[in-house]
Design a protein with these regions (language model features):
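Active-site- or binding-pocket-proximal scaffold segments within functional domains
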Residues: 1-178
Length: 178
């Protein structure tokens, strides 16, 4: 109940939660271009937030805060595709617009978590939580593993996770990752 494991299948393999059949064109493009890699990383970020939610609400392996359908909507809102990369090379304004959209997607995810666990969060005025059972989360340890392309995906996940933690800190009016 204090440890959570999440497995994300590698690109080019079946992963229906993100719309990857792992066969035919999906397998070919997954192996050649890491198709749906971004979706896998966003799914993993949602699962990290689901783990916090499950711990604090004692829902164990039950349904998390984010459904598969909701994660797919986040994937549609988040964009690092070819068009965005080409736009980014044309100027900083387009890159900022894309980055802001991606940041808003992460903010939506974090705000939903905040709303669902508010009694467990520290009140900035009192410095206390109104609900301390099952306990106060002071640290979260994350291990990300992968081999070859999976290692690259694991590194990107860790970088996005740290960015999400920084956004979380900013949303909470703090200076560092929370």
């Amino acid at each position: 109940q204090h440890f959570f494991k999440v497995y994300v299948p590698g690109v080019g393999t079946p992963f229906m939660q993100v719309g990857d059949s792992g066969v035919g064109k999906d397998a070919l493009l997954g192996n050649a271009t890491a198709r749906y890699g971004e979706r896998r990383i966003l799914w993993a970020l949602a699962q990290a937030l689901n783990c916090v939610y499950r711990y604090l609400t004692r829902s164990g392996k039950g349904p998390g805060l984010f459904s598969a359908e909701e994660v797919m909507r986040f994937c549609e809102d988040f964009s690092l595709g070819k068009e965005e990369l080409l736009e980014a090379s044309n100027g900083a304004a387009e890159k900022r617009q894309r980055d802001n959209k991606n940041r808003r997607t992460l903010e939506v995810m974090l705000n939903k978590l905040h709303d669902s666990i508010r009694p467990h969060m520290i009140d900035p005025e009192t410095g206390q939580c109104s609900k301390v059972d099952p306990g106060r989360v002071q640290r979260i340890f994350v291990s990300a593993f992968g081999f070859s392309r999976g290692a690259a995906e694991a590194r990107v996940f860790v970088n996005w996770f740290l960015a999400m933690c920084q956004i979380d800190a900013e949303l909470r009016g703090q200076t560092g990752p929370t």
